[in-house]
Structures are given as structure tokens and as C-alpha cells.
């Protein structure tokens, strides 16, 4: 059984009410819910929230919010693993259920990429969305002071960029695992992790008002709205 759980707390600080703030004409979380529904792989879609308005919004979109997330899992220090472990346990999911944690702030999500997750779990404990760095991280600089910078990897200074290893980072959109892994693992990297690569054009952090404005420009440019 494939289950989707979308964490969506009400107390975002840098962008107030971020999860239901209108993004290109719709509540932010609606884009993620629509993508999950369009993937056509989930038997049930749940939202884990502490907020009555978010609950009302998601119920109107045809997903379930059968429990209230505890206060101690709704602050700035709660981890994804802790939130998911609570949701999986509260829902009483079977250990072998395949569970996707889908972030509410994923308006660029491609349903076909989301659907790759269950297959990846045949050979991994977790499968997560990733995207490549736009520039070689081996050329990263450390700021020692206002008057001094230095290479973090000076041994790479003469290496051609095309010879440097391509590196990836967490795309911050979705995470797949068996229900048992969500409950017993200490982090998403506790075990074997598979990556599901996404195009850089479909990935954007949305943590500040500036991020939000840029994301809306990208979204409209891609013709997604």
C-alpha cells in the first residue's frame, strides 16, 4: 500500500501562513496535493497539521487530516523524522506500507518523478528527491575575514571543471520509506539512500519572501500556473 503524508504546520515564521498562502492563485499546499493525486499511486493521502485552517483547506481538496499534530512536533525544532514517526504510528500503518513524506511547499513537483519512489525502495531504505549543484562544489570558497578568502579544496584549483565529480543536494520535495523505517530510523540518511534526480529548473527553496517571489517568477516562466 502506498501512503502519502504531507506535513503542514501552521506556525511558519519567515513566511507567515506559508503552507496555505496563495501561490500563483492557489494555496501553496494545493499544488503538492494535486501532484500527489495526479501521480495516481496513492491509496490514501493524509496531512499532518496542528492548524484548523490548514485542516479545513486540505479537507476541501479531498485529502484526510484525521489527527491533530502535537504542539511539541509543530515548532521550529521538530524534525521530519519525528513528525513522520508520529503520523505513521498514529495512523497505525503496517510496517511494510510504503510511505511518502511530501513537503507542502513543492509547487514544482512532477508527478512522474514522485511515482519512481516505490521501485527505488526495492534496493534502499530511503529514496529522496535530489538535484545537481549548478556550480562545482569543489571550487567553493571559505570567507576567513572581510579581507581574506580561501578555497575549501585547494587541491582542485588546477582540475578542469568537466573533470570534477558532479554533486547533488536534497531537493526538499519528497522522501520515500517503508513505515517501519520512518518509526525506527534516526534520520533520512540512517541506512541506504537512493536518489531521484530532478531538473534544477524544477527545484527552488521557499524559505524567505525573496525565495517566494523568485519561485512565482519561475513557476509562471515554466507555464505551470
Regions found by a protein language model. Give the residues of each.
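N-terminal glycine-rich phosphate-binding loop and ensuing alpha1 helix
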Residues: 1-48
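Short, structured coil segments at secondary-structure junctions
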Residues: 41, 61-63, 145
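Short, high-confidence coil segments that cap the C-terminus of an alpha-helix
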Residues: 42, 93-96, 123-125, 224
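Short phosphate-binding loop-to-helix
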Residues: 46, 52-100, 108-112, 116
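Short beta-strand scaffold positions
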Residues: 48-49, 176, 206
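Conserved core of the sugar-phosphate nucleotidyltransferase
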Residues: 82, 107-191, 197
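Hydrophobic helical membrane-anchoring modules
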Residues: 195-197, 202-225
Amino acid at each position: 500500500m502506498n501512503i502519502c503524508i504531507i506535513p503542514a504546520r501552521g506556525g511558519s515564521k519567515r513566511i507567515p501562513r506559508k503552507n496555505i498562502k496563495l501561490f500563483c492563485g492557489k494555496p501553496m499546499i494545493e499544488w503538492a496535493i494535486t501532484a500527489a493525486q495526479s501521480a495516481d499511486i496513492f491509496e490514501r493521502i493524509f496531512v499532518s497539521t496542528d492548524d484548523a485552517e490548514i485542516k479545513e483547506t486540505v479537507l476541501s481538496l479531498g485529502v484526510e487530516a484525521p489527527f491533530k499534530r502535537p504542539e511539541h512536533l509543530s515548532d521550529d525544532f521538530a524534525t521530519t523524522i519525528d513528525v513522520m514517526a508520529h503520523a505513521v504510528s498514529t495512523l497505525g500503518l503496517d510496517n511494510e506500507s510504503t510511505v511518502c513524506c511530501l513537503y507542502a511547499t513543492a509547487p514544482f513537483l512532477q508527478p512522474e518523478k514522485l511515482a519512481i519512489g516505490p521501485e527505488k525502495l526495492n534496493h534502499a531504505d530511503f529514496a529522496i528527491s535530489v538535484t545537481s549543484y549548478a556550480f562545482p562544489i569543489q571550487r567553493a570558497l571559505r570567507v576567513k575575514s572581510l579581507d581574506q578568502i580561501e578555497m575549501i579544496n585547494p587541491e582542485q584549483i588546477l582540475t578542469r571543471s568537466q573533470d570534477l565529480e558532479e554533486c547533488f543536494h536534497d531537493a526538499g520535495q519528497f522522501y520515500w520509506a517503508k513505515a517501519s523505517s520512518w518509526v525506527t530510523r534516526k534520520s533520512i540518511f540512517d541506512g541506504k539512500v537512493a536518489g531521484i534526480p530532478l531538473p534544477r529548473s524544477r527545484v527552488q527553496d521557499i524559505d524567505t519572501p525573496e525565495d517566494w517571489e523568485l519561485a512565482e517568477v519561475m513557476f509562471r516562466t515554466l507555464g505551470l500556473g
